[in-house]
UniProtKB/Swiss-Prot annotation:
Molecular functions (GO terms): structural constituent of ribosome
Coiled coil: none
Protein name as annotated: Large ribosomal subunit protein uL30
Family: Belongs to the universal ribosomal protein uL30 family.
GO annotation, biological process: translation
Encoding gene (name): rpmD
Keywords: Ribonucleoprotein, Ribosomal protein
NCBIfam families: rpmD_bact
GO CC, alphabetical: cytosolic large ribosomal subunit
Pfam families recorded: Ribosomal_L30
Naturally occurring in which organism (per UniProt): Pseudoalteromonas atlantica (strain T6c / ATCC BAA-1087)
Quaternary structure (record): Part of the 50S ribosomal subunit.
């Protein structure tokens, strides 16, 4: 069984007053509110999304 590497991403700051592109990126990551944690596949596209909103999220677990 080929298991993809997963990472956990947690939203640490609010999206209120942020750039619309950054709000859309949070939505694309599946994050809705402060403290929300999602487990996502570790791909270059997901890493790029995390880098775009680095000031609002943290990688909890790799």
């Amino acid at each position: 069984m080929n298991m993809a590497k997963m990472i956990k991403v947690k939203q640490t700051k609010s999206a209120i007053g942020r750039l619309p592109k950054h709000k859309a990126t949070l939505t694309g990551l599946g994050l809705r509110r402060i403290g929300h944690v999602r487990e996502l596949e570790d791909t270059p596209s997901v890493r790029g999304m995390i880098n775009r909103v680095f000031y609002m999220v943290e990688v909890v677990e790799e």
